[in-house]
């Protein structure tokens, strides 16, 4: 190792030590994603699923961490490219990497701003904990054109059953029936057992 290399190593170590928030955010993103997906898988094989509050909360945190990591990655690589203590080839590669990640970062932001509200408007289903035929259940409303309500077994504030137990059609309207003073009449309904087999239907 020559003197030049010996000078480079402390400079690189010092440079990396100033980016601890990048490391924290990156590790948080990896750990949170792995824990969430693993827990989701374990729930799924046991006939359970996360409720909306958990899904949206974790999704929002992961999105924020992705944005932070992309921004910090681009900044980190840019600083590598500007570091004259590094070899020219590494600086060039870092500069290219910074440019690519910056474009990805910008694309994610633009797509989020333009299509994010539209995606949320179509994907969001109001959730209600209700008493249905003497049983506590979690109801989800899909009311884009016609009004559909899916009922799942209630487990706790964070988890529900993954199998639809009752699905109802309340006709056209585009409204949330649980926000009405009086629940509208059900046009048709299908009941399922825990295995997803139809046990009765009407309408």
Task: Tell me what each language-model feature is.
Residues 14-17, 79-93:
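Membrane-interface helix-boundary motifs at transmembrane edges
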Residues 87-120:
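Internal/C-terminal transmembrane anchor helices
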Residues 1-20:
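Membrane-anchoring hydrophobic segments
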Residues 132-135, 140-203:
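Extracytosolic and intramembrane catalytic regions of membrane-associated proteins
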Residues 24-83:
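Membrane-embedded alpha-helical segments of integral membrane proteins
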Residues 114-137:
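Alpha-helical transmembrane signal-anchor/signal-peptide segments
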Residues 70-81, 111-112, 117, 145-163:
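Juxtamembrane/interfacial segments around transmembrane helices
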Residues 8-9, 15, 123, 201-203:
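Short, surface-exposed polybasic-aromatic patches that bind anionic ligands, especially phosphate groups
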């Amino acid at each position: 190792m020559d003197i030049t290399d010996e000078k480079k190593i402390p400079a690189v170590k010092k440079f990396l030590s100033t980016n601890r928030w990048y490391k924290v955010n990156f590790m948080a993103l990896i750990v949170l994603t792995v824990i969430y997906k693993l827990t989701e898988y374990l729930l799924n094989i046991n006939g359970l699923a996360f409720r909306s509050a958990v899904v949206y909360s974790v999704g929002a945190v992961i999105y924020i961490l992705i944005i932070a990591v992309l921004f910090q990655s681009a900044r980190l690589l840019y600083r590598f490219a500007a570091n004259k203590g590094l070899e020219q080839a590494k600086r060039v590669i870092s500069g290219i990497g910074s440019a690519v990640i910056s474009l990805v970062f910008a694309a994610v932001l633009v797509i989020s701003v333009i299509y994010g509200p539209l995606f949320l408007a179509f994907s969001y289903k109001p959730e209600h904990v209700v008493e249905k035929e003497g049983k506590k259940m979690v109801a989800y409303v899909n009311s884009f054109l016609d009004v559909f309500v899916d009922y799942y077994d209630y487990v706790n504030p964070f988890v529900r059953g993954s199998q639809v137990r009752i699905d109802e059609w309340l006709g056209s309207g585009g409204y949330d029936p649980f926000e009405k003073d009086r629940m509208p009449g059900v046009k048709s309904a299908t009941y399922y057992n825990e295995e997803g087999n139809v046990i009765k239907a009407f309408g």
